[in-house]
Amino acid sequence: MNSKIKRILDFSTAFGPSGMEDEVSKLAMEDVKDICEVHDDTMRNTYMHFKQDKEHKTTILLDAHADEVGFIVQAIKPNGTIRFLPLGGWDPKNIVSGEVWILNDKGEKISGIVASQPVHFLSAEKRNGKVDFDDLVIDVGATSATEVKEDFHISVGNFMCPAVTCKYDEAHKIFLGKAFDCRIGCAAVMDVLHQLKDVNHNIEATLTTQEEVGERGMDTAIKNLHPNIAICFEGCPSDDTFEQDYMIQSALKKGPMLRWFDRSYITSPRFMRYAIDLAHEKNNPVQESVRKGGGTNAGITHRYNIPTIIIGIPVRFAHASFGICSEEDYDNAVKLAVEIIKNIDAETIRGF
């Protein structure tokens, strides 16, 4: 297995809901420790820059968020089932009957099942009703709250994520796993760093935390950085299986998505046009999107007068327990970022 495939598998499988991204941070630090200076902060934002800084050179920020949508233990019921709340944007019907990992007080991952009232005990009205988080519990197989606390070592405030180990389908060049929003972007940041260690720019890279609950990690990290431009990788939701053809803007295997607008930011139009033109020049497929919803770390960086673009890698079924993404889209996203960094210069950036 080559290093790229292993990197994607490892980042996808890593435990890292918003607020508990430690495992992802450790993966990143280990990955680039030979080429970068690395450190983190108390929020577990991970900072990476090349050991040989170039004085008076352009500084480019590469970012992806380390967290995934997950859950947190809210309360333990007397019968041993667990009430929980979502971390990030979930549709509750997508998680019923799924397995989760609960990181207990000893740092062990305990398996549990997202349970709802069995159909045998539901009235006709409830069978057709809306599923809400208040209707769901996590069941670890315990029969009392005491057992949950003393035998499973599970407490209020423990973090959870879907129990999914990423798989690679070599024949079709696709990945099936969890947390591609934005672990596929985390892997891309690592790949770009490995390809650009000799580039004539200063590269700052971050894996920021708590994006799924309000871009809190980037709001902290950006105050420690002073880039001239920023590229934010995202695992963007693919729309090709439910939109009309003319509205499809992030299809699987059609290239990375460059986003003009979402509810958190308007892109730097001159930087965006530069990236699109360069992609066409290099025969790098890209898709362009305008979104009425959504929000990313770019919504933070551009407020600090930093021209920013989003390079999105399409993910089918983002914010669910399982997603699908394409190796081809990943490769083209990495290639585009590398080409931008290799070709851009200070004069061009001043024009943004």
Give short role names for the model-derived ranges.
Residues M1-F352:
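N-terminal hydrophobic/helix-forming segments and targeting peptides
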